[in-house]
């Protein structure tokens, strides 16, 4: 099986640096032309997002100084920097928004995401060892976007053995991720604005002792023969940090950046220096924000989780590639997932998908499914849920008007139209990965999960793909490329069970006088209810949110009925 010519020669993207053995790496390669390069099917890098920065950014910023960070972590010998780098950025966003405090009680468990990122009993998943298998940033993003975490450190401590991990165990996950943005590694203002808006950005650099001017200043001046990927959370910057602070001597040659300025980085080695475990890395470092180790990313959105919310998905590992194989054949393609709705009284109110087609037009559809589980090819039977533009590269969740969905199978389609853009047409796909020596990731994809819809026949010479406008993506993989493993699309439906928390207009998990106030304010347009809040607010279920619902909540709280008054 080949990989659509997408197996590339590149430095290993594994992120493995622990407190000890800082010069040890799974790959000791230089650039893409290095004779030591290996052919490795690394996860895609995709197009990062460049933001329109219409504000004057300050010369310095620090989430650390603003106390928007949890206590520093200590990864010890465990090669899980990729877990700490991602989780700590999410912690900072939640602290910034006042959702959690900045104590160690708010730590997310790196051990849990590490265990989650090991092979399942059926052989699917990431093919790596617990604690010492290195990792990719995609593991953390897949873990959080599938709502498998974050799990509290108190529930799954650092010292937990792998035997304690149970994929089916239900944890108390209070907040779930709904947005992750990949960043343009070359646009400094985009990165600064993301740090300022979201508190932190997760990225990676080349950790090697010769690149350290001291234990608080790091600078790699150019392509290195000592690639040793290390993941960190960048929580600030300072344009005036002296370039002289980063002078390094490498094999007898002295290097100093040309300009002042540096990024403030949160490490995961405990309080190993006199800067509380933080350090500065020069703006001119060769590998900081490089896509050699995968995309740099920021968490943009999340939602409060409760028993009423359910995420419906055919994959749980997230995007390992971008399905952009049809770009040259079709600039307007609909990608479809068939999802199982297990309960009654479910209302679809959000759709999450992963795409790097920044700026492309998208249309979300509800698509009927026949008795065999195949989405309808008759587009007149589809219901448009929402239209818009792909706002950034990464995982995006769109709110849709609540739609009742029956128990059983439903189709959710994401049409991507890149006709008027330079973007490549694609959708995230959970697809198998390997390098020349070993398998990296095994997909859980099966037939009947993901489909492709095109208005024109782009497979005229492939009978199995030319009979219908709707084709199982597994047929594409097998018939076009002799690949029987394939992958499935990253398209998820989020539902809300109506009536479970009737009256909970502000979605704080309880029904109290604050909900009545929120509803009353919404009637005079001084408060905007979310789509979930509108469902809950309509406590008398008359199809409208008004003062009658306020009265019903007041009666509920007083535990009296209208007949008793």
Model-inferred region functions:
Residues 433-500:
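PGST-rich, cysteine-poor low-complexity/disordered linker and tail segments that act as flexible spacers
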Residues 29, 47, 54-66, 83-91, ...:
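Predominantly the structural core of cysteine protease catalytic domains
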